[in-house]
């Protein structure tokens, strides 16, 4: 998926960059794979899967930098526009 053509995913692109920079390459790779390698039927399906990965990361790694916390929250705000009950 080309982020230039899909500006709605820039938050997730930045999250991937920051996750890698803070040593969370495994979850960054999972998000990158979902965003760029999987052919999704709908954008809402993609957002749901990205949201589940983010929630899993937040559960397993509760302490991160303030910048990463803000990016995680921003990305989840986008996910919750489509999946308001995601937990």
Model regions and ranges:
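C-terminal-biased regions
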Residues: 1-87
């Amino acid at each position: 998926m080309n982020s230039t053509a899909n500006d709605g995913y820039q938050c997730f692109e930045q999250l991937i960059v920051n996750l890698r920079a803070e040593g969370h390459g495994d979850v960054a790779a999972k998000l990158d794979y979902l965003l760029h390698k999987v052919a999704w039927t709908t954008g809402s399906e993609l957002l749901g899967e990205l949201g589940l990965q983010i929630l899993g990361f937040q559960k397993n790694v509760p302490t991160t930098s303030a910048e990463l916390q803000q990016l995680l929250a921003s990305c989840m705000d986008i996910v919750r526009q489509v999946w308001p009950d995601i937990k």
